[in-house]
Regions:
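Sec-exported extracytoplasmic/periplasmic mature domains
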Residues: 105-109, 133-137, 198, 262-266, ...
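Substrate-binding/specificity loop regions of serine endopeptidase catalytic domains
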Residues: 330-343
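Inhibitory N-terminal propeptides of secreted protease zymogens
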Residues: 33-155
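Subtilisin-like serine protease catalytic core
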Residues: 35-38, 52-56, 72-73, 140, ...
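Bacterial N-terminal signal peptides
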Residues: 15-25
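Structural motif
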Residues: 60, 324-328
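N-terminal secretory signal peptides that target proteins for export/translocation
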Residues: 1-9
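Acidic glycine-/aspartate-rich tracts in secreted/extracellular proteins
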Residues: 64-69, 126-127, 147-148, 196-200, ...
Length: 343
């Protein structure tokens, strides 16, 4: 009888201990949350740390008002759906950003508004971060770190090497030639790629570039450069420059990936999976360094391409959007790419 009582008492003791531990942890979390000012609860820790260590920091101001695209009918054509998405996203962003942008101008901050997600890229100090986070129309101040992707050097050079056979081994392995024999080679499809850029004059890519008609090139609506300024982490003097008016690759990886998609020059360089498709592109990295903002800007351009010097809110043309998009890169959690409000 004493053994049963002892066991029963032990169970009660362990249960009470576990209960008290949970209560203590919850109390600590509550105290910690209450200890942080309300505006800080909207701000990513990375932004607070960087803003405290530097005069200025890049961040993304995500607004509460976001477009509801679920109301757009699935029965619409691609062109109709593209127009509906573009109009809905731009309308919400223009309306809700109207009262915030004057404050950014008054603060002398650099900024770039987006509509793909209702947010604004901003470069400013901690005072501005606090001011923006305190606004009721702001949902979140997200991080925008500059991170170098692990792009293998051999990937950048393998594409330019001489090939021994007309059809590359990887293309043959998936039996793509058998599909081509059925008349399916990507014809009528436009592929969008975002990466380190693209060498549009490469012999295996030039004829598939939508901006090339065989005699002259038109890069408007077919190419966009989301790299607008030098990255402090890279050597000065980018070989492509910034806001490049034509496709350019400052690292080589992007050209390699496009070759895998559509590459063929009619001779030995039959290395693409869909050689009949056309391609358009956006540069989202400077020599392998990218940010959530540059990735989002390329996605925005793909939804409704616009000229390099155009206004994304009024000059976008959804009819020129690609049918599919290829991303041969990763965006880890440490780069701020786990936030569904941003990407």
């Amino acid at each position: 009888m004493r053994k049963k009582t002892t066991r029963y008492s032990l169970k009660i003791f362990l249960s009470l201990t576990l209960f008290l531990a949970v209560v203590v942890v919850m109390a600590m979390v509550t105290v910690r949350t209450r200890a942080r000012p309300q505006w800080q609860q909207k701000v990513d820790d990375w932004v607070l740390e960087e803003a405290g260590a530097a005069d200025e920091v890049e961040f993304l101001v995500v607004l509460k008002d976001q477009a509801d695209l679920g109301r757009i009918s699935d029965r619409l054509s691609k062109a109709e759906k593209g127009a509906a998405v573009y109009n809905s996203l731009t309308d919400v962003a223009l309306r809700s950003q109207a009262s915030l942008i004057p404050d950014l101008k008054a603060a002398g901050a650099d900024y770039r508004p987006f509509w793909i997600s209702n947010m604004i890229w901003v470069r400013g100090d901690r005072t501005l971060v606090e001011s923006l986070a305190g606004r009721p129309d702001v949902a979140h101040i997200a991080a925008n770190p500059v991170v170098k992707l692990d792009l293998l050097p051999e990937q950048a050079t393998a594409y330019s090497s001489a090939q021994d056979s007309a059809v590359e081994w990887n293309i043959a392995l998936v039996q793509a030639p058998n599909v081509w024999a059925e008349g399916i080679d990507g014809s009528g499809v436009v592929i969008g790629g975002q990466d380190t850029g693209y060498d549009w004059q490469h012999p295996a890519l030039m004829n598939q570039y939508r901006g090339w008609d065989g005699q002259s090139a038109s890069h408007t609506y077919n190419w966009y450069d989301a790299i607008h300024e030098d990255n402090p982490n890279t050597p000065p003097g980018n070989p492509c420059g910034f806001d490049s008016p034509q496709p350019c690759d400052d690292q080589g990886h992007g050209t390699h990936t496009m070759g895998t998609m559509v590459g063929q020059d009619g001779a030995e360089n039959q290395i693409g999976m869909a050689p009949g498709a056309q391609w358009i592109a956006c540069r989202n990295m400077e020599q392998g360094w990218g940010t959530p903002a540059t990735y989002a800007e390329c996605y925005q351009w793909f939804v409704a391409p616009y000229p390099q010097d155009g206004d994304p809110f009024s000059d976008g043309d959804p009819t020129k959007a690609p049918h599919v998009i290829n991303n041969s890169w990763s965006c880890p959690a440490g780069e701020g790419c786990v936030d569904p409000e941003v990407l």
